[in-house]
Amino acid sequence: IGMVIECKDGYLMEPNGCKRGCLTRPARYCANECSRVKGTDGYCYAWLACYCYNMPNWVKTWDRATNTCGRGK
């Protein structure tokens, strides 16, 4: 019996709708933050934000189409 587990990659998102920043964080900060939400790994991407791999679908990630960062929400 096999199971299909849906996973996604993406930028971690702060409650204010912005990407989770990592410019001044320690080297493993993003990997640790990604593992907290059950992702397999992560790193500080060129946009200076945490990018995670293989997170569960319930994790909210930043999306350009639904971006609310800086809009007071």
Swiss-Prot record:
Q: Which GO terms describe its cellular component?
A: extracellular region
Q: Which UniProt keywords apply?
A: Amidation, Disulfide bond, Ion channel impairing toxin, Neurotoxin, Secreted, Signal, Toxin, Voltage-gated sodium channel impairing toxin
Annotated signal sequence is 1-7
Q: In which tissues is it expressed?
A: Expressed by the venom gland.
Q: Which residues carry this modification: Arginine amide?
A: R71
Residues forming coiled coils: none
Supply the domain comment: Has the structural arrangement of an alpha-helix connected to antiparallel beta-sheets by disulfide bonds (CS-alpha/beta).
Q: So what family is this one in?
A: Belongs to the long (4 C-C) scorpion toxin superfamily. Sodium channel inhibitor family. Beta subfamily.
What is this protein's name? Toxin Td12
* Species of provenance: Tityus discrepans
The lineage is: Eukaryota, Metazoa, Ecdysozoa, Arthropoda, Chelicerata
